[in-house]
Regions:
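Conserved pre-motif I regulatory segment
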Residues: 1-36
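Pre-Walker A (Motif I) flank of P-loop NTPase domains
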Residues: 27-34, 56-57, 133-135, 445-446
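N-terminal cationic and glycine-rich segments that engage phosphates or anionic surfaces
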Residues: 34, 87-432, 436-442, 461, ...
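Conserved helicase motor "Helicase C" RecA-like lobe of SF1/SF2 P-loop NTPases
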Residues: 151, 453-475, 671, 675
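Conserved helicase ATPase core of P-loop NTP-dependent helicases/translocases
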Residues: 478-500
Length: 679
């Protein structure tokens, strides 16, 4: 089945030529191409068109979960009739195993797995194993981490047909080998139940239950039923049941692995004794022997992934299997924000190796633990068949890979131009900045200010607050969810200014921002490199009045490159707009869209679990509260009284054990206190 792209939009501006050039390159067999797309030019839509034209299974790689989720939703919208999957880390919380020699502290692995993401990961692998060609997997760097091999997974697939003669007990053993668990009481995901001649299987990779009925030794019916009502959804003549876990093995492989582990244990104990360290020898002996007993009795143990090399039958140092091994040979990779994603892929191996070095050196793990790892960059690179690097600021590596050939996408469908860049002396920069902020504030526009240090960000914010400017700051010490909330508050108008150290976040979408001010722009370094300056300047490219001010006493090479490149793009965009009679249009974006749809998710939970609304905590609308004219017009004493009354209501709710209501009062207090600071 081919990809079927569904969209109400048609390619415009630079999109048609970008789609054509990239598609032609893929058809020619070009190994690497670069799409240089400016902020807001519709790179995702271009990527979708290229994927549809290529007609190849595609991996879309993003550098973090949040942007991967955005891409996943967009791709699902573009390809509703095709297999669009999501493959990211399934840990809600993860504390890796570690040993700190300086304090003789051993830290056990601790984790919490997100069942929904686990299901999506299994669905991605199942779609690839099915042989479908119309598969798009949107992934984070999790795709380079170890998992079970494709051959073992393929051998664990259970193929059944209506009318097939198959002993029910033989089938049940196959289910167990595919890591499904029998549970006749609570049919959870990855479990099966047996009642007479009927077997119900809660599929590990979907929301449905598969019901198989026998007549004697013959399969009589294969049906998909609703997991809640058990009502029949559809019937099948044949069906493929995929494993319930990404790590499958056979009894023979397990037996062989135990023998090899015991052999390596003997060698490691001998090594520690030879260097005169009996404590480490005793430690590794006790730990591994305990793990072996657990594997023999239960089939698994804590930290079993550290023995994955033995179960996979790999040699020492051989790379682990990963998601890329499940793609056919002729597949496409699209690396989004490649200037960030490529270095991130390169860094994964080193960090993992450094942590495990102490575990092996001090007798907590066998050396085989080193082989449970992410791919080295060279190994990842070898698995690439064809790749498109996508970035507004491609790095030297990507340009070198594409042999200097770059497909540019500079025209925005909205007609918006790259912002003007103004360089001003750093003397009296704060006073000048304050004047600019007041000008924007009077036009109901927002301002981003970047500093070099956290302390500077905090002090500048304090200065602005003292001058009656509604400001806040974000940096690495501010919690992630708080950062998102602060940015949302900026959009709705609680703040006019947001100060930060590194506001060049790829994907940061704030169309209300008309001014980006860069302090100390001439201080060369990571935060003031050509790419960082270009990314930061791009935050003003979504506003029709977008402008960038660089405060500097000299023009560095990085500044010169950014200014010249922005001017070049701006002239091309101006010319295009004049030739086509386009007037730049301000982007109007739903305020709620910057945040995850917590309220919608909660309402779905209400419907799914049949809870009452009072049982679900819905985040209060920050914008609605901030825009309340009564709150805005309150005097300082009135705000103080309101805070005091709300505190009493919060305490009363807590006494009644109504913690959800108490949390809502708490959030109201926080916002009232912020309003009080502005008085």
């Amino acid at each position: 089945m081919d990809f079927k792209l569904t969209s109400k939009y048609k390619p415009t501006g630079d999109q048609p030529q970008a789609i054509r050039q990239l598609s032609d390159g893929i058809e020619r067999g070009d190994t690497a191409q670069v799409l240089l797309g400016v902020t807001g030019s519709g790179k995702t839509f271009t990527m979708a068109n290229v994927i549809a034209n290529a007609r190849k299974p595609t991996l879309v790689l993003s550098h973090n979960k949040t942007l991967a989720a955005q891409l996943f939703e967009e791709m699902k919208g573009f390809f509703p009739d095709n297999a669009v999957d999501y493959y990211v880390s399934y840990y809600d919380y993860y504390q890796p195993e570690a040993y700190l020699p300086s304090s003789d502290t051993y830290i056990e692995k601790d984790l919490a797995i997100n069942e929904e993401i686990d299901k999506l990961r299994l669905a991605a692998v199942s779609d690839l194993l099915s042989g479908r060609k119309d598969v798009i997997v949107v992934s984070s760097v999790s795709c380079i981490y170890g998992m079970g091999g494709p051959v073992a997974m393929q051998e664990s697939i259970i193929h059944i047909k209506r009318g097939q003669r198959l002993d029910r007990n033989v089938f049940l053993r196959k289910l167990v080998n595919a890591l499904y668990v029998r549970n006749d009481i609570d049919l959870q995901r990855g479990c099966f139940s047996v009642k007479g001649d009927t077997v119900n299987i809660a599929m590990a990779y979907s929301d449905y239950v598969l019901r198989i009925s026998w007549w004697d030794d013959e399969i009589d019916s294969i049906e998909e039923v609703d997991s809640l009502t058990m009502r029949r959804m559809q019937s099948f003549e044949e069906y493929a049941i995929y494993p319930a876990n990404l790590f499958v093995t056979t009894a023979e492989q397990t037996e062989r692995a135990i023998y090899q582990i015991q052999d390596d244990l003997t060698k490691q104990v001998a090594f520690f004794e030879e260097i005169g360290d009996p404590i480490k020898a005793q430690r590794i002996k006790e730990r591994v022997e305990y793990d072996m007993e657990m594997i023999k009795e239960l089939g698994h143990c804590a930290g079993i992934e550290n023995y994955s090399r033995y179960f996979d039958g790999r040699e020492a140092g051989q790379r682990p299997y990963c998601l890329l091994d499940f793609f056919p040979e002729d597949y496409l990779i699209v690396i989004d924000e490649s200037h960030v994603s490529v270095p991130q892929i390169s860094a994964m191996y080193g960090g993992d190796r450094a942590r495990k070095q102490n575990l092996v050196e001090y007798g907590f793990r066998l050396p085989a633990a080193f082989d449970n790892r992410p791919l080295r960059f060279e190994e990842f690179h070898e698995l690439i068949h064809q790749v498109v690097y996508v970035s507004a600021t491609p790095a030297d590596f990507e340009l070198q890979e594409a042999e200097g050939v770059v497909v540019e996408q500079l025209i925005r469908p909205t007609g918006l131009l790259d912002p003007e860049i103004d360089v001003r002396p750093s003397e009296n920069q704060i006073d000048d900045l304050l004047d600019e902020i007041l000008t924007r504030s009077n036009r109901n526009e927002r301002v981003l200010v970047t500093t070099l240090t956290k302390r500077m960000a905090e002090e500048l914010t304090e200065f602005l607050l003292n001058h009656n400017v509604r400001a806040n700051y974000i940096h690495s010490d501010v919690k992630t969810l708080d950062r998102v909330k602060i940015m949302n508050d900026l959009r709705v108008g609680i703040y006019d200014v947001l100060v930060g150290v590194n506001l060049l976040r790829e994907g940061l979408d704030l169309p209300e921002v008309s001014l980006v001010a860069i302090l100390d722009a001439d201080k060369e370094g990571f935060l003031r490199s050509h790419r960082s300056l270009t990314q930061t300047a791009g935050r003003a490219a979504r506003n029709v009045n977008g402008k960038v001010i660089m405060y500097a006493d000299s023009i560095t090479e990085s500044m010169r490159k950014t200014i010249e490149e922005t001017a070049r793009r701006r002239s091309i965009q101006l010319k295009y707009n004049e030739e086509h009679g386009i007037t730049p249009q301000q982007i109007v974006k739903d305020i709620k869209s910057i945040l995850p749809t917590e309220k919608e998710d909660a309402m779905q939970t209400v419907g799914t679990n049949r809870q009452t609304a009072a049982q679900v905590y819905l985040e209060p609308e920050a914008g609605a509260f901030a825009a309340d004219p009564i709150v805005l017009q309150m005097t300082r004493p009135e705000l103080e009284r309101s805070i005091e009354n709300t505190k009493k209501m919060m305490e009363e709710a807590a006494r009644k054990l109504d913690f959800i209501q108490a949390a809502q009062y708490r959030d109201e207090i926080v916002r009232l206190e912020k309003q009080l600071e502005l008085k």
